[in-house]
């Protein structure tokens, strides 16, 4: 035995000795707890809570708290956790993974650490892989928690936000992994604090933890909305509008390739889109469409910045090589604006509003633990990614299952013939059989062959969780034959029917090896629960996917030497099993490397997401004036604009700064180049900033009180942040696709992604601050539109345009016949005619 292996075994033994010592201390309270009346036992919960508030740690409370749960489970459920279950509970409380075999009572084991951690009052999430298991476990184990005075909630996808909020406020919340993730993302998209449903993430206990944190690690949770045809129409409308403009209607800053509408252009936009003010807060999305249409038409040049392919696709031209960049798209909606400009089909895309992987979702919990019967093979990944140890827990009774040596056949046909013959023989003697397959297609194929052989059976393809649990529960009855994909029915025990033990227990037949040893072990673990007899047998063929991809030359050469005329010949040897296991290890290594790379990429977004979400949450929960934050954004925007021209010709620089000031800060006629000539950059910055502060104060003076000001500030920031963040996610996704090709140029794609992703994030922050500045300076604020602004903060751009109010009915007593657009409205509202009754006229 190698020194490393010996050390691992010794470490496991040492850990088990520590756990056993704690378990014995828990057991020492058994007689005392049994002597308590129901009332006195239930009174332990408020006592523990008070002791925790007084400074005792959960570790100090553990022995007594675990003992209370054991006794409560005995009285309520008629179940009494064994010592090994106590040991498993301690491992869970420590934030690790106890590897407990199938049938060893993981669900009951979880009650002890869940109860203990719920005493802190910060919420415990019990995570399952489907809603059936969440509902089942919450109903069954919830009886114990409720009896002990703790509240239990079930978070289901169909529940309303109010119902979800109530579930999350419970001491213990049962939910699926996906629903917890989606709720987290949705909470970071709301505008009001009262619309959030989750509390801060405290302790998660994940059932079937390997399935959630390993198998699904590469699958991101994505909240997205398809870009509707209405939105595509807005690209076209914006394009049609900018094509009507004259050169005086927009101002181009050539060095920075930026463009904006002049005052005359703004007037035309308001008339074209029938708006009172283009820069009102609810029109943030529309200004984005117009800005992109301006860039597409007057800055982006055909055959220089892009080309149109024969298929009508817009292809970006690499400015360094002159080659087209297949698969890349301009971000921020610019690509769609160019498609509208060139009259080609606007590609409908789903817009990702938020996304997160399970890896990063569950790493946000203060403490994370999980249960499974098969995790040791993924020990390195659990340790490196989640900082969780795998602690194998002894079974309560010795395992009596017989695991037969694998059987290898030359062809799929000969293998399936052997499987059907084995199933038939066992069916005829009454022994229940569970046939495990890797794919649904294999399940259907075997089912067809069993029908031909006259063998009644059930087929389970993991499509209906409620039905599958019932089928799996009956799979241990005499004469039962069940076909299931490997993951189907996971989490439900197979109990043996009457007389089945004498027949050898449940026989599990694997029709091929999965690429993961862990999945094979899960299938085997269906049989032989809690010391029951059982058997497992795997059938393989050289035509299996795993063998074709990773089968060794030794196996193939051995079969070549055999009589090829007899395809039913079978190989049965330990050497074969070792070779297959070696192939599985290679696949597992490849998969781990892939997941690790996914995590490296996602960590870039994680860091950025945490910054955006933290700032967003700060805005939502703020009960203070957000003026200092907005003023800081205005200051940085002005500084960036002035610095961008510091190295250009002074006259050109002054002209460009004046252009920026007119389009983004002050009324066009109130500033000119003459006013800024002779000033240094710092003096120009101060002058523009002081002018901006005057406009800022004037804007806020239009709102009636501090509550109205705070609401306006919040909606202003949140709308712009959400728009820019959504666009940034798309841009990062495109960047990730692009950098993958750079590996061929000896560049590390991950490093390239990190570097460019950081620069893009900085650019996004600048864009957010610019839009906040421009909207704050240019918006026409009306107190009566405050509630409307909040409503618009959660709608799409298309809905924004459609929802515009057209204006009040005409006052028949007023004379509108000779009123020009920019004249004061005759109704004496104080507004320009175009912004009042003229809206309907035009």
UniProtKB/Swiss-Prot annotation:
Question: What gene does the UniProt entry assign to this protein?
Answer: secA
Under the subunit heading, UniProt states:
Monomer and homodimer. Part of the essential Sec protein translocation apparatus which comprises SecA, SecYEG and auxiliary proteins SecDF. Other proteins may also be involved.
* The keyword Electron transport appears for this protein: no
- Catalytic function, reaction form: ATP + H2O + cellular proteinSide 1 = ADP + phosphate + cellular proteinSide 2
Q: HAMAP family annotated for this entry?
A: SecA
GO cellular component, as recorded: cell envelope Sec protein transport complex; cytosol; plasma membrane
Q: What is this protein called?
A: Protein translocase subunit SecA
Q: What does this protein do?
A: Part of the Sec protein translocase complex. Interacts with the SecYEG preprotein conducting channel. Has a central role in coupling the hydrolysis of ATP to the transfer of proteins into and across the cell membrane, serving as an ATP-driven molecular motor driving the stepwise translocation of polypeptide chains across the membrane.
- Which cofactor does this sequence's record say it needs? Zn(2+)
Keywords attached to this Swiss-Prot or TrEMBL record, sorted alphabetically, are: ATP-binding, Cell membrane, Cytoplasm, Membrane, Metal-binding, Nucleotide-binding, Protein transport, Translocase, Translocation, Transport, Zinc
- Topology within the bilayer: Peripheral membrane protein
Q: How is the cofactor bound?
A: May bind 1 zinc ion per subunit.
Sorted alphabetically, which InterPro entries does this protein's record hold? Answer: Helicase_ATP-bd, Helicase_C-like, P-loop_NTPase, SEC_C_motif, SecA, SecA_CS, SecA_DEAD, SecA_motor_DEAD
Which of this chain's residues are annotated to bind Zn(2+)? 825, 827, 836-837
Protein origin, superkingdom: Bacteria
Q: Where does ATP bind?
A: 85, 103-107, 493
Keyword Metal-binding present in the record's keywords: the answer is: yes
Pfam families given for it?
P-loop_SecA (PF21090), SEC-C (PF02810), SecA_DEAD (PF07517), SecA_PP_bind (PF01043), SecA_SW (PF07516)
Stated EC number for the protein is 7.4.2.8
Q: Where in the cell is it found?
A: Cell membrane; Cytoplasm
Please name the top-level EC class of this enzyme: translocase
Primary localization class, coarse: membrane
SUPFAM superfamilies, per this entry? Helical scaffold and wing domains of SecA (SSF81886), P-loop containing nucleoside triphosphate hydrolases (SSF52540), Pre-protein crosslinking domain of SecA (SSF81767)
NCBIfam families, alphabetized: PRK09200.1, secA
What molecular functions are annotated in GO for this chain? Answer: ATP binding; metal ion binding; protein-exporting ATPase activity
Give the family, as the similarity comment puts it: Belongs to the SecA family.
